[in-house]
Amino acid sequence: MELLTRLVDRSRTESVAAINDLGRWMADAAVTYGRGSEASSTVVLDPCRYNPTFRENEFLARTIGAQVAHAGELVVSKDGVELVSGIKRTKITTIVRRVDDDLLDPNCFRPDSLVGLPELCKAWKNGLVNIVNPPGSGVASIRSFTQLVPEMIREFLGEEPALPVAVSRACSAPDVMQKLIENPARFAVRTNDQMHPARPCFGDSATKAETLSMLDAVRRDPEKFVRRDLLPVSEPRGFNLRVFSSMGKGFYMPRCGIGRHCQSDGGATLAINDDVSACFVG
């Protein structure tokens, strides 16, 4: 909540032009990657209406003047990717994909994916369509990756992080595992594999049976889990903030984003499919 307060205070004294420029910057980036095509030939590939980032995807599409599309509305032909609406077919030059790497194309990655578009990666490889962000960039979604972010800031920027992050530590590290076993009530345990998510276990509210089951699962395969410190009750918290950035002719990140309610370890809630649980912060 402290972060939100600071953002609101700054918005009262600073121009809102930066936020108004968000759509132009991101649309320009889509046009740049689409080899000069109009933003109308861009779609935001969304897995389904009931996914945790639906509001973010909807906001992103509206901002850049694109349409939210699901895999069932797209087809891959010898000429590229087309959006099918009744008898109308629209050629798509850029796909802003909001689908995880492994689910993007069932013919290339996981064959059981129901939200991916068959042959999409082949069309991308042949230069028939551009994918933003490209396959492989999903590595940043791995929860244990967040523990590297502060060190990356220090190493590449020579600065200290401006804001602390809710660090996820890999349970495969012996010291992390030992602390979890000694005092499970202090931590939350989440899966490290975004392809196989499971409901997190919060040690302070878990039953004895749930705690023992969680510890047993972590011992059997520690690589699959990460540990997070539970935030103290007195710690100011309330929202997880997700910002948008674009890399077209230059890098741009506006002073706004999507906020959603936090859980007790700083992680976002599991779903934000209504207007109550998601909000615009600018």
Labelled PLM ranges:
Residues 1-281:
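Domain-scale recognition of functional cores that engage charged ligands
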